[in-house]
């Protein structure tokens, strides 16, 4: 892309693991990755579509109804590390109980657990294994096992059940004004200052610059506490 060496681009891909029922069935409309063989097929399909020899990170998108299926899918990802086709593998949307069981049944520990996390919080859903919101137990389990906790939608953008109010929240904007910064930068710094990796993007150069500038902020303990009450 634009002459940038592949080694300077971090590529993450995800494979699905869902039975054709419940939340996943409603989204996908079909059974996916129910066996290790199917998972392997989906992995190969990803590489064909991407046209790459390797990815930097391959994630299991979410847990299945059946933990056996989650384990089978994850174990299909494990050979990617030895072959060099994935520099690391991990999971997404796994809560503490699902992650603990996975850890007890696989050979390669997930490098990362990517979950929805922001000042806004995220509406929980009654679905096996999911972490959708501020789940201290999941974060603590990740920390205890040296698994990176990563936040998607760190600005509260996509949340089950509605839109986010983060960028218009009075508390967020008050803290931003005190630091001569923006609401987005404060929201991102609230996440990263907790040692969480924030995943965000923009095609607006000024927004990208603002996001990067968030690392120059240091929020006080009282500001962190006040922002935690915004949800």
Predicted regions and their residues:
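Short, acidic/polar
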Residues: 33-50, 70, 99-100, 133-135
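N-terminal binding-site loop/beta-alpha segment at the start of enzyme catalytic domains
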Residues: 1-13, 19, 53, 72-76, ...
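A short, structured active-site edge motif that brings together acidic residues
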Residues: 6-20, 58-61, 114-117
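Lumenal/extracellular "mature" regions of secretory-pathway glycan-modifying transferases
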Residues: 2-8, 22-24, 60, 87, ...
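Beta/alpha (TIM)-barrel catalytic core signal, keyed to glycine-rich beta->alpha loops juxtaposed to Asp/Glu
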Residues: 62-231
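Active-site mouth loops of central-metabolism enzymes
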Residues: 15-38, 63-68
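Local beta-strand N-terminus motif with an aromatic residue
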Residues: 8, 52-55, 86, 110
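Active-site groove signature of glycoside hydrolases
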Residues: 47-67
């Amino acid at each position: 892309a634009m002459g940038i060496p592949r080694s300077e681009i971090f590529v993450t891909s995800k494979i699905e693991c869902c039975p054709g029922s419940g939340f996943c069935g409603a989204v996908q409309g079909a059974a996916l990755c129910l066996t290790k063989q199917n998972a392997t097929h989906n992995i190969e399909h990803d590489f064909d579509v991407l046209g790459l020899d390797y990815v930097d990170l391959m994630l299991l998108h979410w847990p299945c109804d059946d933990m056996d299926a989650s384990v089978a899918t994850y174990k299909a990802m494990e050979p990617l590390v030895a072959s060099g086709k994935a520099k690391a593998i991990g999971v997404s949307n796994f809560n503490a109980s699902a992650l603990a069981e996975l850890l007890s049944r696989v050979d390669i520990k997930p490098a990362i657990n990517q979950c929805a996390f922001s000042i806004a919080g995220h509406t929980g859903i009654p679905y096996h294994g999911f972490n959708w919101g501020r789940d201290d137990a999941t974060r603590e389990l990740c920390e205890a096992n040296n698994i990176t906790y990563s936040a998607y939608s760190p600005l509260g953008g996509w949340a089950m059940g509605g839109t986010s109010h983060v960028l218009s929240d009075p508390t967020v904007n008050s803290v931003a004004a005190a630091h001569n910064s923006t609401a987005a930068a404060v929201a991102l710094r609230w996440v990263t200052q907790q040692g969480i990796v924030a995943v965000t993007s923009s095609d607006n150069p000024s927004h990208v610059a603002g996001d990067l500038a968030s690392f120059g902020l240091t929020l006080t303990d009282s500001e962190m506490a006040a922002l935690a009450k915004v949800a």
